[in-house]
Amino acid sequence: MQKPHKPKDWRWLLHRALSIIFSRTVVTVVLVLAQAVWLFSVFYWLSDYSRLISRVGLAVSALMCLALVRKDSTAPEFKISWMILFMLMPVQSGLLYLMWGDKRPAIPLRRRMERAEAELAPLRTGDPAARAELARRDPRLAETADYLQNYAAAPVFGGTAVRYYPVGDVMLPDMLADLQAAQHSIFVESFIIGMGEMWGQIHEILRQKAAAGLDVRVIYDDAGCLSLLPHNYVDLLRADGIRAFSFNRCVPVLNLVLNNRDHRKIMVVDGRIAYTGGVNLADEYINKVTRFGHWKDSGVRLEGPAARSYANVFLTFWRAHFPDETLDYDKLLPQVAPVAPTGGTLVQPFADSPVDREVVAKNVYLEFINQARHSLRICTPYLILDNDLLTCLSLAAKRGVDVRIYTPGVPDKKTIYQLSRSYFPHLLKAGVKIYSYTPGFLHAKTWLIDDRAAAVGTVNLDYRSLYLHFENSTVLYGGEVLSDIRRDLDGIESVSRRLGPDDCRNGFLGNMLSACLRLVAPLC
């Protein structure tokens, strides 16, 4: 006979329910929604009861509409979405655009970022011999490298050993070993930090190293950790001697600047070893917990001069938030001697930012698509394409390039999954091959171009990564590491299902939903 529940079980359930209801995430969402309802109510009330205000609203909308059309730097998809909003809400949309039409971060942060970039970008010095070697191997790829040098202050490096990781499970032991061996400094930047085995091990090492006198710094995104960390977690880290801050704090105020998130994943040890990729610091990324089947990710370890570039990217972000702090760049950005290269791989780490209007990651992706001669293989968890990317991918397939895109078989966000699948019919018709990773969720952001170059980083194929977030990636030119990436992609394909037109039929309601989602996607 089953025993009845004890009273403490009910108290625990009540405590759990109240903890969820009054959690920071729920309170923030509820307050923001309440403000949104109030704001739209005020707009409609004013338009209904005041002819003068209606006329002013129409005038503002007309001016904002003209300003939007005039903006050459704004993607057509953003313009179309706003134009539809102007038609649906002619009185209110002008004020909405005035408040939230600029997708860049707030002006104070932009100015601090610009000053920090101006201070640290000159310290990102590369190896002229590496650029010359790349030009000798592949002049066209060297032009892409020049673009990154000129518009992202991202030089090319030789003398850097590169290791590719097909899953976070394999990457973690090396990360822990390098952290344990740190002698001077440790920098950690992550979109998500979650309490558990992975972060617990890393945090303990950071605490020990900080106590030993090393310079240990941590940056995490507040929205990414909103439901995962206590609201005062920065104070807890500082109590351990770890310098830390959470980026773009989530406050219950209706503000689309919250869209600008720090999506980077960077770990730098002593300025000479760096890790990056799609792996956040939470247990699902090393398959210690199961959320959406097997979690497939990727990452790279850089040892040598290229790692210094990621230390510079981290410190640029840090400098923007602590402009008055004295930073000893000779100590924090030490010169790194070349190490034995892995198969002669040339390395080019770069960062992308919404502060300027240069969509660096998107332009690099377009370069890769247009340069592909024989094959182009892409891993992405989300496939929300603007017209430029959709056209270039289709054209590459039509001119005979073997274009293969690997997507999740088990989605983490069903609405985004539905939106991603809405692009499949067009791509399939053009000859693009699309695969669904049946074991679970594919979170890797890996590109392989003709076995000539690859990219491993944080950049998804969606509007948020390409236009709104702070991102980073590593371009790899040649060498044995490309063979490792190719083997990983072959492994993904062996357990994936190739999709056909019949897999993409949504019916009338599904197609209408996808159309609506496409209209809303650029605004979110």
Q: Where do the protein language model's features map onto the residues?
A:
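N-terminal localization/anchoring segments of enzymes in phospholipid and broader phosphate metabolism
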Residues: 1-363, 367, 371, 411, ...
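Structured, soluble regulatory/oligomerization domains located on the cytosolic or IMS-facing side
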Residues: 186, 373-376, 402
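Helical hairpin unit composed of two closely spaced alpha helices linked by a short loop
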Residues: 382-403, 408, 413
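Short glycine/threonine-rich loop-to-helix capping motif typified by GTGT followed
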Residues: 391, 417-421
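CN hydrolase (nitrilase-like) catalytic-core segments centered on the catalytic cysteine
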Residues: 419, 428-431
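Active-site donor-binding acidic/aromatic loop of nucleotide-activated sugar
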Residues: 434-438
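Catalytic-core elements of nucleic-acid end-processing and repair enzymes
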Residues: 445
